[in-house]
């Protein structure tokens, strides 16, 4: 048995060892912290910021580093990179300014936390990216995954499943035949809008945004579910779900780019997705059940088409819900946003509004209502819509980015697999080297002279491709453009649009999922046609 003295000595020795261990632990933690900060600062010094520094440092270690392959771009801040570029409601403008500053309009690199990003403000490089099979995939953000969009056309990985969805949608929803079949519903909805606008007092400003969003939602519900949706009864619940989805998908989620934040959900986006998805499931599942209980041999609408698929094309119920939810979600925003921008420009430029209305009166007259077949004879109105798409593209960054699935070369620079690629269509459409007087509203630039080919905005010319290009081009581009043309023509044929006061029109913008007017457009209406 140890003596009292021995026990005291052992205790003293253990105490010293304990103190020594604590000191070593503290020293080790301090050393690790210093090394971590030093590495972070070192990686941050590379062009493009920390994510690019990490990649380039790895190539330097492996001996494959080449100075000429470095893509210029902002460093941003240590660890987070240039998150501030994308956190802004004017991200497209900030990115354009950064590209100008770094002389990198053709190709610029920047970091979103640990995510490598390239962006181009050049139409030739944009075509190279969008038409390359290497960029056939999209980066799936946590919000998109949580909202089930990874199983729908927009975010599904490029492959057999994606091609199946694309083919089904193209044949049964977005084909020329289906667009023509849906003409009646668009006319009915346009008549409802006219009736609503007629009831507005000519002495009070009319705010058309909510009407356009409601009409767009109704139109999409008709296209997808084959019958008029009772908006008066249920539109509040559905509008709230769609608006919440827009907000979630349009918000830069820090945990997508800073994995060490994922456990904390600092922006509460995951929590909000978890609240929204059960509501969406219940809503869409109820409609699917109603269709299953209906009798009939031939598919009547898009839901019936999806339910009738068999063999390798057959979709599970969760996949059907994801596809239908995306159709509702994506089809209700762009049309409303774009028409509001067009009407704002018509209020701001009454002389051009008169030109459009004179064209309508010559083609349609005032004795009858507009018909969709009249649209082909309205070149100036078509030019107005294209010019608004140029100045105010709803998706200035083409909404959703692309993902490099392998190492590739873009504009002579090496772009590694896993890099996110973006096209700043707003910067392209405002570039004085691409467009004459790019800040001026000049619809006549799109009026084809005799012998000229009409300028297409449907993806073939990357000077203006608001619907994208290549494999991931928007499948509903023709339907969307037709709807915008018809409803805009109807509103300008039936009403004269004027400013609500003497303060002009506020053209300030806000980028969410789409780039919309920061404040709803107020206008005073005067009936043109009795």
Swiss-Prot record:
Expressed in leaves, sepals, petals, stamens, carpels and developing ovules. The keyword Membrane applies. It is found in: Membrane. Disruption phenotype: Reduced seed size. GO terms for molecular function: heme binding; iron ion binding; monooxygenase activity; oxidoreductase activity, acting on paired donors, with incorporation or reduction of molecular oxygen. InterPro entries: Cyt_P450, Cyt_P450_CS, Cyt_P450_E_grp-I, Cyt_P450_sf, Cytochrome_P450_78A. Pfam families: p450. Its cofactor is heme. It is a single-pass membrane protein. Heme binds at residue 474. Keywords: Developmental protein, Growth regulation, Heme, Iron, Membrane, Metal-binding, Monooxygenase, Oxidoreductase, Transmembrane, Transmembrane helix. Plays a role in seed and fruit development. Functions probably in association with CYP78A9 in the regulation of seed growth. Acts maternally to promote seed growth. The gain of function mutants eod3-1D (T-DNA tagging) show increased size of leaves, flowers and seeds, but defects in reproductive development. Belongs to the cytochrome P450 family. This is Cytochrome P450 78A6. The lineage of its organism: Eukaryota, Viridiplantae, Streptophyta, Embryophyta, Tracheophyta.
């Amino acid at each position: 048995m140890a003596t009292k003295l021995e026990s005291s000595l052992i205790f003293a020795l253990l105490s010293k060892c304990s103190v020594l261990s604590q000191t070593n632990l503290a020293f080790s933690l301090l050393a690790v912290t210093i090394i971590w900060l030093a590495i972070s600062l070192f990686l941050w010094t590379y062009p493009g910021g920390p994510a690019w520094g990490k990649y380039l440092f790895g190539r330097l270690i492996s001996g494959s580093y080449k100075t000429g392959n470095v893509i210029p771009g902002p460093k941003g801040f240590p660890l987070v990179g240039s998150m501030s570029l994308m956190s802004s409601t004017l991200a497209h403008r900030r990115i354009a300014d950064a590209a100008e500053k770094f002389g990198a309009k053709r190709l610029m690199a920047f970091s979103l936390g640990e995510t490598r990003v390239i962006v181009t403000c050049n139409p030739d490089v944009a075509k190279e990216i969008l038409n390359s099979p290497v960029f056939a995939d999209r980066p799936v953000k946590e919000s998109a995954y949580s909202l089930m969009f990874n199983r729908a056309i927009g975010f599904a990985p490029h492959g057999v499943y994606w091609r199946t969805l694309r083919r089904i949608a193209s044949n049964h929803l977005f084909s020329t035949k289906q667009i023509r079949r849906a003409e009646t519903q668009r006319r009915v909805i346009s008549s409802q809008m006219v009736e609503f606008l007629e009831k507005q007092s000519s002495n009070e400003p009319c705010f058309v945004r909510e009407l356009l969003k409601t009409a767009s939602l109704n139109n999409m519900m008709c296209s997808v579910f084959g019958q008029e949706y009772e908006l008066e009864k249920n539109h509040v619940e559905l509008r709230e779900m769609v608006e919440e989805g827009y907000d979630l998908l349009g918000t830069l989620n820090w945990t997508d780019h800073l994995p060490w934040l994922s456990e904390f959900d600092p922006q509460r986006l995951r929590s909000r997705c978890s609240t929204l998805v059960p509501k969406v499931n219940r809503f869409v599942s109820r409609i699917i059940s109603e269709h299953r209980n209906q009798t009939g041999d031939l598919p009547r609408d898009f839901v019936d088409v999806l339910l009738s698929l068999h063999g390798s094309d057959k979709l599970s119920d969760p996949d059907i819900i994801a596809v239908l939810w995306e159709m509702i979600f994506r089809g209700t925003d762009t049309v409303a946003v774009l028409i509001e921008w067009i009407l704002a420009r018509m209020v701001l430029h009454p002389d051009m509004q008169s030109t459009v209305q004179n064209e309508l009166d010559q083609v349609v007259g005032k004795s009858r209502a507009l018909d969709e077949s009249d649209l082909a004879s309205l070149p100036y109105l078509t030019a107005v819509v294209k010019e608004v798409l140029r100045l105010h593209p709803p998706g200035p960054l083409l909404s959703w980015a692309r993902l490099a699935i392998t190492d590739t070369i873009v504009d002579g620079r090496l772009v590694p697999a896993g890099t996110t690629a973006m096209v700043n269509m707003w910067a392209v459409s405002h570039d004085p080297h691409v467009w004459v007087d790019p800040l001026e509203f000049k619809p006549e630039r799109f009026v084809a002279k005799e012998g000229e080919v009409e300028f297409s905005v449907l993806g073939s010319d990357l000077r203006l491709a608001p619907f994208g290009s290549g494999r991931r081009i928007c499948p509903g581009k023709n339907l969307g453009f037709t709807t915008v043309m018809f409803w805009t023509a109807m509103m300008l044929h039936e009403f004269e649009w004027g400013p609500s006061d003497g303060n002009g029109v506020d053209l300030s913008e806000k980028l969410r999922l789409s780039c919309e007017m920061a404040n709803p457009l107020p206008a005073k209406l005067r009936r043109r046609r009795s």
